[in-house]
Amino acid sequence: QRKGIHAEVENGEFLGLYRTKYILDEKPLISIIIPNKDHIDDLDRCVQSILKKSAYPNYEFVIVENNSTEDETFAYYEKLQKECEKVHVCRYEGPFNYSKINNFGVSHAAGEYLLLLNNDTEMINEDCLEEMLGYCSRSDVGAVGARLYYEDNTIQHAGVVIGFGGIAGHCFVQQKRGTTGYCLRIICAQDYSAVTAACMMVKRSVFEEVGGLTEELAVAFNDIDFCMKVRQKGYLIVYNPYAELYHYESKSRGLEDTPEKLERFHNEIRIFETRWPEIMKNGDPYYNPNLSIVRGDCAFRM
């Protein structure tokens, strides 16, 4: 009340830990942008998990078709659009470029809020959209990420630290579900320098203000770069552990396992380092410099 924030504060799982639940006075439209190439089993699991589980009613799907080759894929699109008026399919014709595909999807979206979502994800909790929207609706917040799990119920994403692996990486990877992490960071809502766009909500106004995703970064680091641009404009990047999904990771795109893909990857490293030299030199402001950037579990530097 003192801060004029419409929210309730609950006791968390442990003494001294609190959970803020934002009360949504309105139900703005959320456009869920999902790039897709074939793999309709993954896409259907993603879409159906939201349709069946989400308690939040006002959303649309913008599925961005990119270079599918299987007839079953297009038959599925047609069937899904007939069965569900929330679904819209648009076609991006060009080689895979994650940034261009999502920017294209946003141009076909009607929502005040955007949820960039990979097709190989699956919503777990019914209040996932409300949880992300609650933080994203704050005037000082630009983007919100979620807690993501691998299929074996270990952590895939709980925030991103600049410097991990030489450039940037996810925190607490492969720690067991239910683990709290260093200083309870896995289970605390908090600010980070970046979150993954495998599931990232952003205000449309902020997305447009920063010019969307940087299209020079076709595959790697485009989400980290986007978060850097958002922070540069003075907005916060929030990790919300109470929005939970599975992420089966890069099933449709495949691995970085060819000379061409490796060359592109190293070029994108150079682009990112050139664009953000200060944070690469000084380190992540949301990470203790006494902790390891070799390991992702916040162990002490040795």
Question: Model regions: which residues?
Answer:
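Short aromatic/hydrophobic "clamp" motif used to bind/position activated sugar donors
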Residues: 114
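C-terminal, non-catalytic tails of nucleotide-sugar-dependent glycosyltransferases
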Residues: 1-30, 152, 164-191, 237, ...
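A conserved hydrophobic helix/loop-capping motif in glycosyltransferases and polysaccharide synthases
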Residues: 30-42, 46-49, 53-54, 64-66, ...
